[in-house]
Amino acid sequence: MADTGLLISHAFDEKTIQGDELYQKLMLDKLEINSGMLVENIVAQMFVASGHRLYFYSNNSRTNADDRMEIDFLVEKPQLTNAHNICPVEVKSGKNYTTVSLNKFCKKFERQLFTPYIIHGMDMKIDNGIVYLPIYMTSLL
């Protein structure tokens, strides 16, 4: 879904929450919603608007926990540099989160990766080779 407003309106049963009530809950940060879904949709929309194709990675291995991981987006670098042109991107909507899948992915595919990113609602930083970007900087990737 490329329209975040349309996504929000479809996420709620019209009989459950009326327009004014939805607006008030949204403005007062009291909306009970899977914010991860919403933020991932916003990031996907920003990637598409910036000309990126949307790719993701998912492995639900039942036999090997080390292979079990999911990466929200895989972004290609415009130029191939020593086969390191894939940037894994994880989107985090909360303040407290883990990077288990991203760490596993980086370890498994380190020869093909350029820079791993985490898009989150906090300030920019670089920690252990991972670039943490605020959501509004997504379009700069």
Region spans (language model):
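A cross-kingdom feature that marks ATP-driven nucleic-acid transaction machinery
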Residues: 1-141
